[in-house]
Amino acid sequence: MAFKSLLSFVSVIGALQGANAALTRRVACPDGVNTATNAACCQLFAVREDLQQNLFHGGLCTAEAHESLRLTFHDAIAISPALEAQGIFGGGGADGSIAIFPEIETNFHPNIGLDEIIELQKPFIARHNISVADFIQFAGAIGASNCAGAPQLAAFVGRKDATQPAPDGLVPEPFHTPDQIFDRLADASQGEFDPILTVWLLTAHTVAAANDVDPTKSGLPFDSTPELWDTQFFLETQLRGTSFPGSGGNQGEVESPLAGEMRLQSDHTIARDSRTACEWQSFVDNQPKAQQMFQFVFHDLSIFGQDINTLVDCTEVVPIPADPQGHTHFPAGLSNADIEQACAETPFPTFPTDPGPKTAVAPVPKPPAARK
């Protein structure tokens, strides 16, 4: 079903792009500079410029960009049709509840630490005419666009803001089993996000870092290139873990192959699960797949709980990211001999090893106070 949906999505996008190029009349925006296919998108140009200059440091793939993308997931995934079927409020999905009720939702265990990016984003929401729900997803898309190699992510306006907080227990934790994570995503997506699409969604970890898994360390990247949207994450999670970057023994953490690199237990187990191991390996050195599949799942994730027929597509406002940089490689000191082969169908591909002493990964600096 997922692949049929993707084919339909790609076909529709291609048809719309062709039709738009030939038929769409653009609207002149009130700023006298920009034009848009829908007047509702005009407001986003000012939001974009404000974000780029005053939150993302002139358009950089920094901690603020990483955390803004993370926030999109933690807001959107908080929806459960299964709870609703029991007569229990199951959350509103991509409705902004995590930022509207931060005193409640940022105290949920998987959301610990997100209060910082929510506080940084508050002044931007206050000075622009945009719903909290729309802002969270838009800021995540803009933040990701600053990471070379990323896809252009979807942006919509018209979401309804939350009127009550989401219940606890709806955001997956790094210590959850694959079955728990697969079941949670299937519930939130009404069956669309199967184990394969879960792998696609985890592509976001290519530009992610952990601030709260290890209480003694912050900004621990999940791969050696957290500033790039590449496929090193998929390669490095299949390397044999040898040590912890900090105190070790923390819930949701397993040994990683590189000094300074964090490996989540959930990434480790999904990369080695028989249902997902080959899909995981298929992302290694496949940049188009790392872009297209995440673009697809983000599109759907960003509208969980919303009626797409009431939304306006403003993806054109999101910058097209820079081309990917570098090449797939084994970090210095490691090679195919260090791979824990999990896919039974296809041998792990061979790549060059970086020269020099064994790679150590620098932490991603925590966000300083954004310029108000």
Curated annotation (Swiss-Prot):
The active site is at H74 (proton acceptor). The lineage of its organism: Eukaryota, Fungi, Dikarya, Basidiomycota, Agaricomycotina. Belongs to the peroxidase family. Ligninase subfamily. This is Ligninase C. Its cofactor is Ca(2+); heme b. Its EC number is 1.11.1.14. Residues 346-372 are annotated as: Disordered. The record marks R70 as: Transition state stabilizer. It holds the Pfam family Peroxidase_ext. Pathway: Secondary metabolite metabolism; lignin degradation.
